[in-house]
A protein has these predicted regions:
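Phosphate/diphosphate-binding glycine-rich loops and adjacent basic-rich segments that engage nucleotide
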Residues: 201-236, 240-246
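Glycine/charged-rich beta-loop-alpha catalytic/anionic-binding loops adjacent to active sites
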Residues: 128-143, 227-231, 351-352, 383-387
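Acidic-glycine-rich active-site phosphate/pyrophosphate-binding loop
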Residues: 115-135, 213-226, 346, 377
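A short glycine/serine-rich beta->alpha loop
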Residues: 4, 138-147, 230-237, 388, ...
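Acidic/His- and Gly-rich active-site-bordering loop/insert found
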Residues: 4-136
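Acidic/histidine-rich catalytic neighborhood of metal-dependent amide-processing enzymes
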Residues: 129-217, 256-273, 277, 284-291, ...
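A generic structural motif
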Residues: 90, 143, 230-231, 288-296
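Metal-dependent amide/peptide-bond hydrolase catalytic core
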Residues: 2, 244-435
Length: 435
């Protein structure tokens, strides 16, 4: 894709950037063993590198794993370096190729009808109540929009542009990073925290206006393999052990009050995310989530108990449990430096927005970065209903996110450079193991 010139980038605004980015296909692929997981992601990575170079950020580069980094030098001596991060991959579980963005100007409060036949209303999307008169961006309803997280990418790029346009805005060094594969939990697998060199960072990867998030799930991703015994269906009595039925028993044993569709706020869950197999063998991909490590351990013990019961009730059944990944709650790391959240909350207030602190019922690149010694809470982008064909974003909320970004780096410019702890080896992830 053509790289806009310096003057265009400085003047076009955040929405022009966003519309350009969402029309570049960049879904990730959880089954891939490559980094990045899809070749599509290289196009937007190289475009962003080109745009950063066009803006005059001379150290802009995309590395061998499609991580894009650059530095905006500071104009205040001895100010600490702050980082701004977003990811450019999109969720692979919803169609994300060929996005056709639409702008619905001056939302009047009624139902928004998309060309696909899908609709958005204040009933199905209560956040729209706060967006009367706003310009709302959607896809045509056949794909997701990609506000998660190309809204964050566009907002960080526009933050840089505003700082460049107005030399009177005082700031220290600003490091930016755009990462691939966040949606599959691999966004910072190859991220070099010491080289990045920031004392704190912020992911722009949140939702509705005002959200400031410094607490996320503890997470374990699991692969459960149930092995049965196949037999001729006409002579199966006493011989067949149907792995499909075993999987049904497993799913039925998960308490109905402990599922994603029945939990909220600080409640954790067990979730069957994917299932495949036949009579002889079934594989289930499962997600365990809780805000405390004790709660997560309890859920794992519960699942292990269910599997033990299956094997006892069905001689010939075998159950294997493997941990395939996970992450931990970053709150303990973010809280080590009160400035990290304190300045974020002040930046939101200074932009005329009331901060909304709530737990992230998911994970971000920031969760793992925090355990590597780079405290990284999450800020709103103005995008809502992520991972859906009815994903949408408010233009006005996106513009507020840019205001917050600009104000945030100004506030950090007033801080004194301090010695920071050495980066940790703890990745915040659970090791691959089997049970």
């Amino acid at each position: 894709m053509h790289v806009p010139d310096h003057d265009t980038l400085l003047t076009e605004g955040v929405i022009a950037k966003f519309l350009r980015y969402v029309q570049i296909d960049s879904p990730s692929d959880e089954d891939s063993t490559h980094a990045p997981s899809t070749t599509d992601q290289w196009e937007i990575a190289r475009l962003l590198e080109g745009e950063l170079l066009a803006l005059g950020l001379r150290d802009a580069r995309v590395d061998a794993h499609a991580i894009v980094t650059a530095t905006l030098p500071g104009n205040v001596p001895d100010a600490p370096t702050v980082g701004l991060l977003a990811h450019f991959d999109t969720f692979p579980g919803t169609p994300g190729r060929g996005v056709k963005p639409l702008i619905h100007q001056g939302y009047p409060g009624d139902t928004i009808a998309l060309p696909s036949g899908a609709t958005l209303s204040t009933v199905s999307h209560p956040e729209l109540v706060h967006c009367l008169g706003h310009d709302i961006i959607t896809s045509d309803g056949t794909t997701l929009l990609g506000a998660d997280d190309k809204a964050g990418v566009a907002e960080i790029m526009e933050t840089l542009c505003r700082l460049l346009r107005d030399p009177g805005l005082k700031h220290g060094p600003v490091r930016v990073a755009f990462t691939p594969d966040e949606e599959i939990g691999k966004g910072v697998d190859h991220f070099d925290v010491p080289t990045f060199g920031a004392v704190a960072a912020y992911t722009f990867d949140g939702g509705a206006q005002g959200e400031v998030e410094a607490e996320n799930f503890n997470a374990t991703n699991l692969r459960v393999t149930l092995t049965g015994r196949s037999a001729h269906t006409g002579y199966a009595k006493g011989a067949m052990v149907n792995a499909l039925h075993l999987a049904g028993e497993l799913m039925s044993a998960i308490p109905s009050t402990m599922r994603p569709e029945t939990t909220q706020d600080f409640e954790g869950f067990l979730h069957v995310d994917e299932i495949a197999g036949n009579v002889e063998s079934v594989t289930l991909k499962m997600l365990l989530r809780d805000f405390t490590e004790a709660g997560l351990a309890h859920k794992r013990a519960m699942l292990e108990g269910i599997l033990t019961g299956l094997q006892q009730r069905h001689p010939g059944c075998q159950a294997k449990l493997e941990v395939t990944g996970g992450y931990r709650n970053m709150k303990v790391e973010v809280d080590r430096d009160p400035r990290v959240m304190g300045l974020a909350l002040k930046a939101v207030r200074d932009a005329g927005v009331a901060p909304v602190q709530r737990p992230i019922r998911g994970g971000t690149d920031g969760a793992r970065l925090s355990f590597l010694g780079l405290p990284t809470p999450n800020l709103f982008t103005g995008g809502v209903n992520h991972h859906s064909r009815t994903e949408w974003a408010s233009v006005q909320w996106m513009e507020k996110a840019v205001e917050v970004g600009v104000r945030l780096v100004q506030l950090w410019a007033g801080e004194r450079l301090a010695t920071t702890a050495a980066p940790r080896k703890d990745t915040g992830s659970f090791p691959i193991a089997s049970a």
